[in-house]
């Protein structure tokens, strides 16, 4: 226990005093501090669960409490948020509410509760507060104690700021936000036209570059992005018009190729079949449990006809021919069928849909 405490103290001190630092620099300073096994500390650091340390876009590490001290991030309050005392965190507040993942920042400076909640994950708490899932932003929300926003005098459309002070996180009602003079331009410089950046990391990098950034309230990050022709999806930042779907598809195919030692074409075929399996799973979830699989299949075929997607089914038939390779057939099962019966049922539905479109060898596989 004492050794773990010493490592925590060492990481906090090293990054607070000398960050941002590369992992090699951290390891060297840990050794100088008397930590016997720097590699073990670095492994714990990479998990991002024990300490409020995070990486910049260049992979250097920073101590967030030091980097964000005195900075304020704003969010324009939505109607549901005003009613239910919560603030959507993505993208406006992500850079600072990351701190809420750590116990000491799970409450505001005044002692009131503040925690990140997700629809479908924090169901019991949301039900207790009478908050419907659809009111929660997909990226999550910072849930405040009832009456917090009313006490602040904040209503729908108002700007609310979250600032890190020496006492912890505090909420501020923002009257008029100042003009952004550098952050938007710096974020535009940080994004790669071919690869999105992790959004909070880009903002933290901008904070390292400009010690004055966000020390006074400016417009919400969402609005700053719009002003500079940038776009975001979930936690990712990219130039306007970036094709996130194609990027995710390529990444997933590369992962499958690496995981199973596949050539690129086989990885594309496998991932396309996995995505079709996901579609079948969603279709089954939305279907009456008493409906027979063949009825579900008929519904899927009817939907394909109504939406003009016969060409897609034909294309997937071509890809399904890859199942003539026993290895790909085995990998499809491994990637889609879990411990529940839903995965197997969806796979059966997928097989039945593809059967008329694929060669006999693939049907046998």
Q: What role is predicted for each listed range?
A:
Residues 25-31, 202-204, 221:
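A short acidic, leucine-rich amphipathic alpha-helix
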Residues 314-365:
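Extended alpha-helical scaffolding segments
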Residues 166-177:
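Short, Lys/Arg- and Gly-enriched loop/turn segments at beta-strand edges
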Residues 123-143:
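Short, basic/aromatic beta-hairpin or loop at an interaction surface
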Residues 31-40, 209-216, 355-357:
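Short, basic interhelical loop/turn and adjoining N-cap
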Residues 1-24, 183-211:
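Positively charged, polyanion-binding regions of nucleic-acid-associated proteins
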Residues 1-7, 36-80, 230-247, 255:
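Charged low-complexity interaction tracts in eukaryotic proteins
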Residues 64-126:
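Extended boundary segments
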């Amino acid at each position: 226990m004492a050794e773990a405490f010493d490592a925590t103290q060492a990481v906090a001190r090293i990054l607070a005093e000398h960050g941002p630092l590369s992992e090699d620099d951290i390891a060297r300073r840990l050794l100088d501090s008397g930590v016997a096994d720097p590699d073990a500390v670095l492994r714990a650091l990479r998990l991002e669960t024990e300490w409020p340390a995070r990486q910049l876009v260049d992979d250097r590490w920073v101590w967030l409490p030091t980097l964000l001290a005195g900075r304020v991030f704003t969010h324009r309050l939505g109607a549901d948020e005003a009613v239910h005392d919560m603030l959507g965190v993505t993208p406006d507040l992500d850079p600072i509410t990351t701190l809420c993942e750590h116990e000491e920042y799970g409450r505001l400076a005044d002692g009131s509760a503040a925690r990140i909640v997700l629809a479908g994950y924090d169901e019991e708490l949301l039900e207790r507060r009478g908050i419907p899932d659809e009111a929660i932003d997909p990226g999550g929300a910072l849930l405040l104690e009832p009456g917090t926003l009313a006490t602040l005098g904040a209503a729908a459309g108002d700007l609310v700021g979250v600032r890190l002070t020496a006492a912890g996180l505090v909420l501020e009602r923002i009257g008029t936000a100042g003009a952004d003079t550098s952050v938007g331009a710096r974020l535009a410089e940080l994004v790669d036209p071919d690869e999105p950046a992790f959004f909070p990391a880009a903002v933290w990098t901008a904070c390292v570059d400009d010690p004055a950034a966000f020390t006074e309230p400016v417009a919400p990050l969402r609005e700053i992005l719009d002003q500079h022709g940038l776009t975001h999806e979930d936690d990712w930042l990219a130039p306007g018009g970036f094709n996130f779907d194609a990027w995710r598809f390529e990444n997933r195919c590369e992962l499958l190729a690496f995981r199973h030692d596949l050539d690129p074409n086989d990885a594309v075929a496998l991932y396309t079949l996995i995505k079709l399996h996901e579609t079948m799973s969603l279709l089954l979830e939305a279907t009456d449990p008493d409906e027979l699989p063949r009825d579900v299949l008929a519904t899927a075929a009817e939907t394909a006809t109504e939406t003009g997607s016969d060409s897609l089914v034909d294309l997937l038939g071509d890809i399904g021919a890859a199942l003539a390779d026993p290895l790909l057939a085995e990998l499809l099962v491994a990637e889609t069928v879990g411990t529940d019966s839903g995965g197997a049922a969806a796979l059966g539905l997928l097989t039945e849909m593809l059967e008329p479109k694929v060669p006999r060898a693939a049907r046998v596989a």
